[in-house]
Amino acid sequence: MAEAEASGFALSPAALATSVRSVDGKPVAYGKPLDALKAGDTAGYLTLLAGMTEAQRKEDRFYNAYLALDRAAAGDTAGARAYLGLTGGAEDDYEAPGFYLWLDSWLMALDGDLDGAINRHREVASGMPGITGDLSLAAMLEAAGRNEEALAVYDALTPTVIQAPEHEFDPQGIVFAHISTVIVRHSLLLQRMGRIAESQAVYKKLADAEPEQATSYAAAIDSLETGKNLDNKSLTTKTGFALALSDVAYAMQQQRFIQTVMMGGNIEGFDDQRASFDLAILLIDPANENIRSGVIDALYEEALYDGAAHVAQTAPETSPALMISAAQALLMGGDEPSARKAIKNALSIADNDDRLSTLYGALQLRALLNDKGEAYELVPELLRLAENPAEKAAAHGIASSIYQHFGDTSEAADHARDARRLDDTHERRMVLADALGQAGQINDALVILRSERLARPNDPYTLNSLGYFLITRTDKYEEGYKVLARAMLLAETDPYIADSFGWALYKLGDIERAKGLIESARDDLLPQNHWEIENHLGDIYWHLDRKDDARKAWETALENYPPNSERVLIEEKLKDGLKTPKPEKRPLPEISLEDLEVERRDI
């Protein structure tokens, strides 16, 4: 950092607040920018960028943009333009990259020239990815108080027919996500303008596209009138700019994903471009909890728990949600005392508006910590605070998972039934089937699972749930194998489905093939681990006379928070070894074309 300071480089107060400090209070030094990103240290990241030569920064067009955003956060728009190589004059800057020109339109808005910024935006935003140029214009129009023009933008972006995805793997989900963004913002703007009936009518377009989610949509539509759970503030220039930047970051991430998939690849590892973009956005709008949560989630997914906790704990104002996020990261990082303290603090500052959502997070973390008494004390309050059917269904769903974790399977099944009664969706039915299976009500569970398969024959996770149930809760191994083979065909890169299919092979005695498939599932999940995959590998290694590897896998399973009932069984295996006999090898079931028939569009 000293080299950058010597060259006249200065950080904004927002950036300085993100600095990770060593025990002596000095900023941590990093060997390369990626290390600073993984620590959630925007100050360290920008310092390394500033220390590069101009030629080095030009290797990535966003490096100068991030430094420019920090200058903008400090109120120095002239310094921001200097990093972008802009003069602020349209005639002088016309050869600059389109993204830089788009940034310049927002710099004009930050300077207070909103009408000029809007005109500039309309001139330069045509090359922005996807619909981000239009969304950005709508945000700028609203920040300028030109709400009717912003509404017209949203109207133009809304299609006449809205089609929801059939399942999680349906590519239509990408389109639906963009449409949902448009409709939600349209609806919220109308609500801010006091046009409640129109706001509800717009939002109902999403509800009509997903009739099975009627309970959740009804609660959301009602909140547009009551304001419950709705923090709907008018956009300012800074919050509008941050929103537009976030849209661009998401769109570019989606483009990278689609391009990789089209080339036969798979998205793996830490997305440093999205992380650096989001951390820079937080310089403009540090209080934006949605963007902050996205950064935390990205770091968490890559097992960068220290970085996730740091980002959660360095917000300008703390909140119960951020404390719960910090607690989760601290827990997974091995600091259980600090995690418990963060949970306690989150509950202590939660008010009536966020008490229910805080309880959701606190309960799940108490379960992972095996704090049974504390968890059971919170369940009645959770159920009492839930008011509308959507909240009550969610509360019963959480209660079911808590009781399930601690082995109270009958109580868990009862709450899962209540959740389904209140909110009869595919997700609730699948959770109920699992709870019934855990409670020994196998036939009732199978009725649900088979019905869901008939309704969603090309949903890989529905097939996975049925197939895995058949091989673990019944003796219908052959049928389970065939169902899982179809799931694999539809989602061959999904590690959880690969684990299930591998376990079907194990049950049929093909242990070597099972090992290879489940080991690949483990590798695909890295740097995360899953207790069930490790537990499966432990059993496989034991039967292959790899006793040390088996014990190591079971130990890893225990470190990754299995349910209590499974924890007891794994601990017994660690102590006494595996007592169940090696599965007898059987001929693998023949799979007909009918079993695997899948339309190409479904793949």
Language-model region placement:
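Alpha-helical segment of the N-proximal tetratricopeptide repeat
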Residues: A2-L11, V28-D41, F241-F277
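TPR-repeat structural position
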Residues: F9-P13, T42, T77, L114, ...
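Solenoid-like repeat scaffolds
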Residues: L16-G25, A50-E59, G85-E95, H121-G130, ...
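Generic helix N-cap/helix-start motif at coil->alpha-helix transitions
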Residues: S22-G31, Q56-Y66, E91-L103, G127-S136, ...
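Residue-level recognition of tetratricopeptide repeat
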Residues: L34, L69, W106, A139, ...
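Register position in tetratricopeptide repeats
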Residues: K38, A73, L110-D111, A143, ...
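Terminal, low-structured helical/coil segments at or just beyond the last alpha-helical repeat
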Residues: N232-A251, W531-H536, H543, D548-I603
